[in-house]
Amino acid sequence: MLKDQLEPLLLKVQKPIRYVGGEFNSVVKDKKNIRTRMALCFPDNYEIGMSHLGLKILYSLINAREDCWAERVYAPWPDMEALMRENHIPLYGLESLDPLREFDFLGFSLQYELSYTNILNMLDLAGIDPLAENRTNDDPVIFAGGPCAMNAEPLCDFFDCFQLGEGEEIMLEFTDLYRKAKREGWSKQEFLIAAAQIEGMYVPSLYEVKYHEDGTIESVMPTH
C-alpha cells in the first residue's frame, strides 16, 4: 500500500500534514459501494488549494451521492515531489491514498495561468501521459474548469474536455452520463462525443482550430 511507502518519507519533508488527509469533515467511503471516483485536483500547494471555496462546493456536491466519491489532490512541495520520484510513489488522492491512475475522472481547477506547468507536472507524477492523444480507454477522463477554462486553447492538447461556466451546474449531468457510459461499455471517445452535447462542455478533439500568423484564432470548425 502507498501508506506503508509514504510513512518513512513524511519525517523528511516540511509540513507532512499536507500529504496524509484525515482532516475534520473529509469524506472516506467504502470503495465496494462506489461506481464513480473523481479526483478534484488543485494545481498548487495544500495551503492554497484547501481553502478554495469552489473545490469545497464540488467536493460536497459529488460526495452527497452515495455511489460517487470525490477526493482531493494538491501539488506536492518540491521536497516531497523529489522523494516521491526517488521512491517511485505516484501522485494519489488524499482520502484513499490510491494512485490517480485508478480514478475515473481527474478534474483540475484552472484559477491562474501560472499554475499550468504544475498541471503537467502533476500528471507526470501520477504516471499519466500529459498529451490527451496518447491516452487510452484505460486512463482517467481528464477535464478542467474554473475561470481560465474560458480560454481553453492553450491547454487543449492536455485535456479531454473543459467545463465552461458554473461547475456545480454541469458536474452531476457529467457524472450521470459517465455512469451510463460505464454501464453500457462505451469507449472514451463515445463518452466524449456524448459529453459534448451537455451545455457548457467543450471537447477539443471534436474541433479543428486554425490560427493567424500572429497566434490569434482564425476559425474553430467541428470535425464530428
Language model: regions and residue ranges:
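N-terminal [4Fe-4S]-dependent radical SAM core
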Residues: 9-39, 46-47, 210-224
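A generic structural signal for short, non-catalytic loop/turn and secondary-structure boundary residues
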Residues: 31-33, 63-66, 194-196
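Glycine-rich beta-alpha loop elements in corrinoid/cobalamin-binding modules
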Residues: 75-222
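Low-complexity, highly charged intrinsically disordered N-terminal segments
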Residues: 38, 42-43, 49-61, 67-84, ...
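Internal hydrophobic scaffold segments of catalytic domains
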Residues: 50-67, 168, 199-210
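Short secondary-structure capping/turn segments at boundaries of alpha-helices and beta-strands
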Residues: 25-28, 58-59, 95
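General detector of N-terminal leader/presequence modules that precede the first folded domain
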Residues: 36-38, 44, 49-65, 110-115, ...
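Helix-enriched interaction subdomains in cytosolic or periplasmic regions
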Residues: 1-15, 65
